[in-house]
Amino acid sequence: NAAKTIADIIRTCLGPKSMMKMLLDPMGGIVMTNDGNAILREIQVQHPAAKSMIEISRTQDEEVGDGTTSVIILAGEMLSVA
């Protein structure tokens, strides 16, 4: 359920009509972004499945450099039908 929540948060950041998200950074400042990778870097999660989703995104970014939002949405959909 936590991994699906991560996918639902990131889902609206994909495509030409993506929506901006407002985040609080560790210093208390407001960050507005529609970059899925930036959002996943800023959020803190405790659930192991959600941590795995974020690790998938980081690996995608390191190996390919793009597609972090897509890989999270794809993994979330795979978990929802499992």
Curated annotation (Swiss-Prot):
Binding site for ATP: 15, 67-69
Main location: cytoplasm
EC numbers on record: 3.6.1.-
GO cellular component: chaperonin-containing T-complex
Described function: Component of the chaperonin-containing T-complex (TRiC), a molecular chaperone complex that assists the folding of actin, tubulin and other proteins upon ATP hydrolysis. The TRiC complex mediates the folding of WRAP53/TCAB1, thereby regulating telomere maintenance. As part of the TRiC complex may play a role in the assembly of BBSome, a complex involved in ciliogenesis regulating transports vesicles to the cilia.
Single GO MF annotation: ATP hydrolysis activity
Gene name, Swiss-Prot/TrEMBL: CCT3
PROSITE patterns the UniProt entry points to: TCP1_1, TCP1_2, TCP1_3
PANTHER family xrefs: CHAPERONIN
Coiled-coil annotated residue ranges, if any: none
Localisation: Cytoplasm
Name of the protein this chain belongs to: T-complex protein 1 subunit gamma
Reactions catalysed, as given in the entry: ATP + H2O = ADP + phosphate + H(+)
Domain of life: Eukaryota
